[in-house]
Amino acid sequence: MTTYYSGKPPIETGWIAWSQYFKEYGKNIDVFPEVDDTTGEPLKIKDMKISDIIGYKPIYSQILEKNDDLMVCEIMPSYVKKKTALTITADTIDEMCKGIENLCQTEKQSFIFAYCDNPDGIIHHTGCYSNETKEFIKETENRFTNLVEKLKGTNTLLLISADHGHHDTKEKISMLDLPEIQECLTMPPSLESRMISFNVKENKKDKFKQAFESRFKDKYKLFTKEELLQSHLLGYGKEHRKIDDFLGNFIAIAISDTTIILENYLRREIHGEDRKISTHCGLTQDEMEVPIIMFDLK
């Protein structure tokens, strides 16, 4: 989402995954909600916020710097932190579409960024091909069809897309069940279950690589930090100063329907077992490709 919010790739913003290790806090932090990844507790440090470390200029500010006559607005779920002065709360697709419709009826030129956390949430819990997912997609398609009809003649360019795809998981393996890999690490892994950053002991690099590839050779693609950066999977541009901190010396990215669950005993005790049926951040086509749908409603 940060690429949408900033107009820049992860390599430049430093926002590369859900949970990143911050040496400033000495722990893995879920960056969007700003909570401890293990306990789920919010950060309570006044003198050092996430935005102080990996802050960025929102696209709204960038637009207003070029043309302050525009009306710049975001439509977001109620739990999302505001990033611009004019923010409309919408917790459903209906509310989001209604907000777009109302704003587009005004005479003032505007830029509107709207986001809904479904179908992502539904797919996580029921899978890509569940009845719940199919029903939501059909209802959403109907709602957008109605929106397009209502926006005709308003000189609106409507773009519909997503921040990632999804892939159903058929095999889950907990880090707790991988002692041969755990013993090679200096600290808990981070980032995502399908894009994992490993900080490996210098004297255990060969053992780690052998252990990982013997178990996951056809399931994850293993990169060194240098190989990942050279691949430009994080995009092109000036490297953020924290990238070197956030990436371990090995990174594994899923290429199959196997997912390694990043958990420790405390996290499992607090949150229970991971129940996601579908997830993302791997290199499968389903996860990498997103649609871009455009309506030019003059």
What are these regions (language model features)?
Residues 1-298:
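Feature captures the catalytic ectodomains and active-site-proximal regions of enzymes
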